[in-house]
């Protein structure tokens, strides 16, 4: 089983696993540490996500009602790409999430909003470390079994922070008049004064559509879903399409890549600097193309699902 989110999302299954000694792979090394602490009976290993490749695409048939033909995908030349910058992912309005908190009693509301404000101020801290600190501040010493249940019960905090920063990054670019093509649902619900610069496709999209959008872009923007020692597949998918990956960082990414060599990092803490960074990148397409090509070489050699499958097989035959 590959846990594609923090283990707190899977507490009920992990506490009573459906298969004895179920083997678990986590996509973030902090998630691995969390598993070893709170679910020590389950074998767990680190397995970073990989990128998705477009192998073929359908060319529409000139005859109405007929299926198109499958053709091998060809890389779109960097200078001829349709989009300057794309983001692939849905948006959940944070106001909707806050309403759930507002339904709680006054004491709980204060507790939850203190956590949210602390996470906004310290986005480098993992969700479980932040939640544990606030739980212990409120309740003192708590046994690990009770602590893991309490953390799992606050999954909405993680969802809130993902949505908050996703919205803030897109809004930051739009309000500086930098057009961003977003592929995903609900972006019209983002509280932003510059919606003309958020070009929406208006619906949920599948992985193939996401990869195709990234393949036709010069820059693929990533906002990490609170992975502090792992990565999201958007990073490697961009690299495999010869597209520059622009992402907030993590310890794992810093260990494996160099800023402005195979990708470009920005800071959530200093997101006000992002618009100027994007403008400078778009002014230097040749440099962007060089970074994208180095990213491709790295990803195709080490970060495809074929290589991840080989790693799993090697682990299973140990």
Where are these regions (language model features)?
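Active-site proximal beta-strand in glycosyltransferases
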Residues: 1-6, 23-26, 49
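Catalytic binding pocket for nucleotide-activated donors in carbohydrate/polymer assembly enzymes
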Residues: 17-19, 34-40, 61, 78, ...
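Nucleotide-sugar donor-binding catalytic core of glycosyltransferases
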Residues: 38-60, 77-228, 250-253
């Amino acid at each position: 089983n590959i846990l594609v989110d923090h283990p707190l999302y899977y507490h009920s299954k992990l506490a009573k696993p459906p298969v004895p000694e179920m083997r678990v792979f986590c996509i973030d090394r902090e998630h691995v540490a969390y598993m070893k602490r709170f679910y020590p009976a389950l074998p767990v290993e680190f397995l970073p996500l990989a990128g998705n490749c477009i192998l073929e695409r359908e060319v529409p048939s000139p005859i109405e009602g007929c299926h198109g033909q499958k053709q091998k995908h060809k890389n779109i030349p960097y200078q001829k790409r349709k989009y300057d910058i794309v983001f692939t992912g849905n948006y959940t309005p944070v106001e909707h999430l806050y309403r759930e908190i507002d339904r709680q009693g006054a004491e709980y509301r204060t507790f939850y909003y203190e956590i949210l404000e602390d996470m906004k101020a310290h986005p480098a801290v993992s969700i479980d470390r932040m939640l544990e600190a606030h739980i212990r501040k409120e309740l003192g010493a708590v046994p690990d079994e009770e602590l893991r249940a309490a953390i799992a019960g606050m999954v909405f905090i993680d969802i809130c922070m993902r949505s908050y920063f996703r919205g803030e990054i897109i809004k930051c670019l739009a309000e500086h008049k930098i057009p961003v093509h977003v592929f995903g649902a609900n972006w019209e619900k983002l509280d932003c004064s510059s919606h003309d610069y958020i070009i929406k496709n208006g619906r949920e999209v599948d992985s193939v559509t996401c990869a195709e959008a990234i393949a036709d872009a010069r820059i693929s923007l990533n906002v990490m879903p609170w992975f502090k020692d792992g990565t999201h597949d958007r990073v490697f998918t961009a690299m495999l399409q010869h597209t520059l990956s622009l992402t907030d960082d993590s310890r794992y990414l810093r260990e494996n890549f160099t800023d402005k060599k195979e990708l470009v990092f920005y800071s959530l803490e200093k997101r006000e600097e992002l618009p100027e960074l994007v403008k400078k990148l778009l002014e230097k397409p040749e440099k962007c193309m060089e970074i994208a090509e180095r990213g491709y070489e790295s990803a195709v050699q080490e970060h495809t699902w074929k290589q991840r499958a080989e790693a799993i097989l090697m682990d299973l035959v140990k």
